[in-house]
């Protein structure tokens, strides 16, 4: 039986506080110490500093997914499972995965969220380092909506955060 991987989450209070940069900095430290680290998917949102921090780390090619007349790039879950790194970086836990989901895929068909991909990686014995903002926590959706006037459409069940082996706050 495969030992379940560990999950570390960089948790921030808002977009742009440095979660992804903190995750990438940790990845460089681990990689420099000889650990098998792979960038599964990192969203740089056009930020040069974030993009530069990906340099020097192995990066899994993204999967191009046709959707509503366009193409989107997503984590290639099957390739990640096949590569089976010791540690994989998976940015933005709350992200909704775009595209078709079928029985031949490792990705659950019922509700394709990036956190589902993280669970598949953990179940395969791969350690995952990820990021999320606090407003994406499912139990806070009503509070966030009341304060901001905007309901979060992409949420992460509280259990996912409870399942994390380590949570690091970034503010």
Q: What function would you assign to each model-found segment?
A:
Residues 1-5, 10, 163, 170-171:
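Membrane-embedded alpha-helical bundles that form conduits across membranes
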Residues 4-76, 82:
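Conserved P-loop
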Residues 27, 77, 115-119, 157-161:
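Short amphipathic alpha-helical segments and helix-helix/interface helices
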Residues 29, 43-48, 94-95, 128, ...:
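Conserved nucleotide-binding/hydrolysis micro-motifs of P-loop NTPases
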Residues 36, 84-87, 124-130:
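Loop/turn-to-beta-strand initiation segments
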Residues 92-115, 139-142:
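Conserved ATPase-coupling elements of RecA-like P-loop NTPase cores
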Residues 112-133, 155-156:
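Substrate-engagement module of ASCE P-loop NTPases
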Residues 130-171:
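Internal gly/pro-rich beta-alpha loop/helix module
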């Amino acid at each position: 039986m495969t030992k379940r991987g560990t999950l570390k989450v960089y948790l921030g209070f808002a977009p742009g506080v440095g979660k992804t940069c903190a995750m990438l900095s940790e990845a460089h430290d681990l990689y420099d110490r000889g650990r098998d680290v792979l960038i599964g998917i990192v969203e740089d949102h056009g930020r040069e500093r974030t993009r530069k921090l990906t340099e020097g780390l192995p990066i899994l090619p993204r999967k191009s997914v046709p959707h509503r007349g366009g193409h989107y790039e997503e984590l290639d879950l099957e390739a990640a499972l096949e590569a089976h790194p010791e540690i994989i970086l998976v940015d933005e836990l709350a992200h909704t995965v775009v595209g078709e989901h079928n029985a031949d895929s490792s990705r659950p068909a019922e509700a394709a969220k990036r956190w589902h991909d993280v669970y598949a990686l953990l179940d395969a014995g791969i350690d995952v380092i990820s990021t999320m903002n606090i407003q994406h926590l499912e139990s806070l959706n009503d509070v966030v909506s009341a304060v901001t006037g905007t309901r979060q459409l992409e949420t992460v069940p509280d259990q996912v955060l409870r399942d994390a082996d380590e949570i690091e706050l970034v503010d």
